[in-house]
Amino acid sequence: MAAGFFISKSVGIVGIVLALGAVATIIALSVVYAQEKNKSSGGSGGSDTTSTTTASTTTTSTTTASTTAAPNNPWNRWRLPTALKPESYEVTLQPFLTPDDNNMYIFKGNSSVVFLCEEATDLILIHSNKLNYTLQGGFHASLHAVNGSTPPTISNTWLETNTQYLVLQLAGPLQQGQHYRLFSIFTGELADDLAGFYRSEYTEGNVTKVVATTQMQAPDARKAFPCFDEPAMKAVFTVTMIHPSDHTAISNMPVHSTYQLQMDGQSWNVTQFDPTPRMSTYLLAFIVSQFDYVENNTGKVQIRIWGRPAAIAEGQGEYALEKTGPILSFFERHYNTAYPLPKSDQVGLPDFNAGAMENWGLVTYRENSLLYDNAYSSIGNKERVVTVIAHELAHQWFGNLVTLRWWNDLWLNEGFASYVEYLGADSAEPTWDIKDLMVLNELYTVMATDALTTSHPLTFREDEINTPAQISEVFDSIAYSKGASVLRMLSDFLTEDVFKEGLQSYLHDFSYNNTVYTDLWDHLQEAVNKNSVPLPDSIGAIMDRWTLQMGFPVVTVNTLTGSVQQSHFLLDSNSTVERPSVFNYTWIVPITWMTPSRTGDRYWLVDVSATNSDFSVGSSTWLLLNLNVSGYFRVNYNQENWDQLLQQLSNNHQAIPVINRAQIIDDAFNLARAQQVSVTLALNTTRFLSGETAYMPWQAALNNLQYFQLMFDRSEVFGAMTKYIQKQVTPLFEYYRTATNNWTAIPSALMDQYNEINAISTACSYGIAECQQLATALYQQWRQNVSNNPIAPNLRSAIYCSAVATGGEEVWDFIWERFLEAPVVSEADKLRTALTCSTETWILQRYLQYTIDPTKIRKQDATSTINSIASNVVGQPLAWDFIRSNWRTLFGQYGGGSFSFSRLISAVTQRFNTEFELKQLEQFKADNQDIGFGSGTRALEQALERTRTNINWVKENKEVVHAWFRAETASS
């Protein structure tokens, strides 16, 4: 292990030495640091002796970890007291990128935090998790008064591991209005757990390269250094990284200075960065790597795209570089606020838990969300890159410049970014019509969850969200997709210009500070008043009904009488809503509408029921509500109007806007699941698809028919269903075969490319021989010349899956080898997912075992791979057995804070529709109470509710559905 020293530049002290070599030297020189700081600033810390303490044990009685369970003790509460307010940190870290004598990767560091005492107190609580401290005078930290006076002495310190605090008890109180500095020296593990300061790896040739990187959100900055780790505790950060000289260090801000040191024959660089603006701990980031970058310095903001050298050399960063500048410019205009920092670094990491993270000025991504290679990446990969970039850059203002006060309002942060990502992406790719996709990707996806009694409001009470697992659980589809959908609705009824006006004043007023969601409502109300926007009530009164109660309404209209009413839409109409609502689950609903002859003015439904004469159109024409699905609600009609809409779809479907053709399908299927219309009416909405070539209606139908597949692919119903889908998709397959000159040309429009993929994937997966023969032929061509893949990137997922499904071990092994050597992560993702398409039980069982072996499947991909296996009818019971037998291992790896953990529970239970499976799920819950379910707790309750709903739905609809499919295919 390398040894030596570095020069630390802490506040008010220059030239204090912190050893970086052998443990004894580290301890001795750490004491020198503490002693010198005491001399300079009146330190408190006991006698000048040192020892080392770990996160679980200590060496002296003064630092023994507390075992007190009294909930009234401040250190047993999850939230910080408000007595202390941090103002600045100086953090120095040195990651060691080779294992130590214990075969562990570690980092060492010191941290100095200056804080203001706002209320006199004799207790300091600061977050710390899995850090080992070098004791100073027998204590974990030393305390100094900034003005040179003598601070109170420390009487006791310990690590409260449950609530993740370093606790310091003082012999006297800190004085109100006085500034203090807390200094600590620590060591942590540079683990591969994807949290805090962690280790990522990749291979270059046969050499393993190690990257030291970060993921602080939500509660993991405390795993990198002791800090007041709550979003409202904003401060200025000065970061210094000590790193091998052949590596580069980057952080939120530009490099301020760098110099080189020789320590025991190894060359180290000490890189200090400019101080950050006031910001939250969860947005801090630093990376030490041998990555390369491409850059654009033509504007006032330096833009760099970083990644593995091979990926950058192959041009995989060029698309992100091309689009980042225009997206930043778009948001500067949209927010009427200049980008707040001098640079924008974006880094593609080989190992990353989330999709991306909006660290201020240093955004981190999974490689598949930043890197793009035209030779390997599909149009879906390209859309993913531009939308994720737009999402993260949107946060640079909304979330970073102005930040939520606490995680109970996460929806405003993530929902807003999930909405405006479509606006930013549209500005970068204006020919794609990408804003329309929000209806399918966000609104309809989240409604499936929000129609459960186990859903939750967008905004929680602040006291409902406390523990790290509770915080992680808030990062769900409700926060992201419902938040986006509700804000889209708000922007629509205000108009985008008025919405932007309120947004801009909100950002200007709260820059570098924290807010609650009502602050945005106040600024939007000012814009409404200024522009005289007619509304039935205040912004707060309207929007509170959408944010403070879960769910959404179904609006039912009778076109014979003009009556319109609303009710809480639940997939299981017999379920009981236990969460109370002061609004009694009613909403103020903005309704847009049209008939064949005109488009009407927006109508507001403010009561449970009303009558609107404009809606009384009779039985000989149709009425359509919720144009472009701008409102977050479903629509039901009297049978006569449904018949008219179905007739219009049959005669000339293009008379109805394309988004609303998708709406008719999605509403009908979900109303049928809720027993508000017949299941045959829902199925009838798919008849016109034999003449439809647009993507959105087809995707809406496939999404809903997938539920039928999940419910019936283990029964005789699936045979008749397969014949029907073959009948409907064959014209689409033929249409795209002709349009693409036998699959050799790529359609120009984004939506057309997506629907070509639908045509291939549906035809192959439902057994159309011509499609499967195409897949086999393309696979064989590739097999004969591995270096020349003849399959177009857009079609690879479908073709690979079909080849694996219809092949055996030989095909699986070939695809596995290609996965291991894939040069682009988007290609590796396609191959990894295709491997789950096997119909061989033993192969899928082996693949499940691979998911818990990080040498075969990266940790970041483990849960999504299990999910894909579970989506396979052969793999589903295997995945369920695997989850149950490996729950402790999986929970230990992913349960506490993984964004994907809740999806794991949902995926493996999505087919459950029998009493036996319900009992298994209930037993699973009972058997694992001691371990817990962490961030999957709510997902488990939702799985139980879905299963009960599925049981009832299948009982009531199986025979009717079977008869309908048989009748539709009787002549085929």
UniProtKB/Swiss-Prot annotation:
Residues carrying sugar: 38, 110, 132, 147, 206, 269, 296, 513, 574, 584, 628, 684, 742, 785
Any GO CC annotation of this UniProt entry: extracellular space
UniProt cross-references to Pfam families, sorted A to Z: ERAP1_C, Peptidase_M1, Peptidase_M1_N
UniProt biased composition (Low complexity): 47-70
S-S bonds: 764-771, 801-837
Top EC category: hydrolase
Protein name: Aminopeptidase Ey
Source domain of life: Eukaryota
Active site: 392 (proton acceptor)
EC number: 3.4.11.20
Similarity remark: Belongs to the peptidase M1 family.
Organism in which the protein naturally occurs: Gallus gallus (Chicken)
Residues at which substrate binds: 355-359
Site keyed Transition state stabilizer: positions: 480
Tissue: Detected in the plasma and granule fractions of egg yolk (at protein level).
Bilayer-crossing regions: 11-31
Assembly information from the UniProt record: Homodimer.
Cofactor note: Binds 1 zinc ion per subunit.
Membrane topology: Single-pass type II membrane protein
